[in-house]
Amino acid sequence: MASLSSSINSLFLKEFFGAFFLSMRYFFRQKATINYPFEKGPVSPRFRGEHALRRYPNGEERCIACKLCEAICPAQAITIEAGPRRNDGTRRTVRYDIDMVKCIYCGFCQEACPVDAIVEGPNFEFATETREELYFDKARLLDNGDRWEREIARNIAIDSPYR
């Protein structure tokens, strides 16, 4: 009985036609592939990309040198040096470095920050030729924040109900 069923299936090419109709069903659908360098797919507001330090609207940097991001970083990729207290009692950072080679993009630094100073922005295209270029200092992080501020603020506003 098994050989009869096997010969009927092979006679009528059951597997071939099943595979053919399956491939035809997907052949006429819209393609899922995009031409990457020229087209970019949608990025989630929660995407964790290149790090950035944000500023207040008046231009002052947000980081208050509380060092919570440095303490919570599981990869120990963040190094902060706090400056002396100012006349108004606040502190600012003198040095803020992130070693992006060590970073695991977990987002803990962003969640720990009480003033939303350090964020992971929408940029995922920051490939470099040397490892030294992946050592971000304060100036580079502030430049990233200035460059991506509009998108970062929009993403934080979209994600705010879930924080």
From Swiss-Prot:
On the tree of life, the source organism's domain of life is Bacteria
Q: What are the alphabetically sorted keywords of the record?
A: 4Fe-4S, Cell inner membrane, Cell membrane, Iron, Iron-sulfur, Membrane, Metal-binding, NAD, Quinone, Repeat, Translocase, Ubiquinone
Binding-site positions, [4Fe-4S] cluster 2: C73, C103, C106, C109
Note on how the cofactor is bound? Binds 2 [4Fe-4S] clusters per subunit.
InterPro entries, per the entry: 4Fe4S_Fe-S-bd, 4Fe4S_Fe_S_CS, NADH_quinone_OxRdtase_chainI
**According to its UniProt record, which reaction does this protein catalyse?**
a quinone + NADH + 5 H(+)(in) = a quinol + NAD(+) + 4 H(+)(out)
Family annotation (Gene3D superfamilies): 3.30.70.3270
List the GO molecular function terms. 4 iron, 4 sulfur cluster binding; iron ion binding; NADH:ubiquinone reductase (non-electrogenic) activity; quinone binding
Primary localization class, coarse: membrane
Q: Please state the Enzyme Commission number of this protein.
A: 7.1.1.-
Q: Which GO terms describe its cellular component?
A: plasma membrane
One Pfam family in the UniProt entry: Fer4_7
List cofactor names only.
Answer: [4Fe-4S] cluster
Q: Which PROSITE patterns did the record assign?
A: 4FE4S_FER_1 (PS00198), 4FE4S_FER_2 (PS51379)
Query: What SUPFAM superfamilies would the database entry show?
Result: 4Fe-4S ferredoxins
Q: What's a BP term from Gene Ontology annotated to this protein? A: aerobic respiration
- Subunit structure comment from the entry: NDH-1 is composed of 14 different subunits. Subunits NuoA, H, J, K, L, M, N constitute the membrane sector of the complex.
> What is known about what this protein does?
NDH-1 shuttles electrons from NADH, via FMN and iron-sulfur (Fe-S) centers, to quinones in the respiratory chain. The immediate electron acceptor for the enzyme in this species is believed to be ubiquinone. Couples the redox reaction to proton translocation (for every two electrons transferred, four hydrogen ions are translocated across the cytoplasmic membrane), and thus conserves the redox energy in a proton gradient.
Cited HAMAP family: NDH1_NuoI
Q: State the similarity comment.
A: Belongs to the complex I 23 kDa subunit family.
Q: Which NCBIfam families match?
A: NuoI, PRK05888.1-4, PRK05888.1-5
**Protein name listed in UniProt:** NADH-quinone oxidoreductase subunit I 1
> What gene does the UniProt entry assign to this protein?
nuoI1
